[in-house]
Amino acid sequence: MATLTTLADRLRSELGDLAKSFVWQTTADGTTNRFLVPYSPIDGATLLVTVDGEDVSTSVDVEETTGYITFDVTPDTDASIIVVGKYFRYFTDAEICQFVNDAFAQHTANHADAYGRGITLLNLPGLEEYPVVIYASTLALYTLATDAAFDIDITA
């Protein structure tokens, strides 16, 4: 029985996009409420943000792709801000899940099980899990290649 989580984990493993932990600390200036965490993409779901030792994670907006965090309330001058979490090399969890969902939908289109029921993640045969992950890897790698194509500096 496949789940989105297990397929997403296998995709991350295939891509070498495994989570790494980080701790980042800064001091507030009393006027800035938006900070760039020097790690991205970050996992916003598990991010812990403290201001002077108080957990304010629920009152912080996280831009997972860019690594920016925005406080609802500007931290006081000289307040210690500590951010603890996980970051990835290439993709956010949402992007990984989208690749898996797209690959699954395309892999199982117009297919049914032995009883004529549509294929779902729950009844996906174990033999079919790896092809879905490989197809999702292909989609992810095409995305990276397309992104890299825009990074080429052609000025001579």
Where are these regions (language model features)?
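Elongated alpha-helical scaffolds
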Residues: 127-145
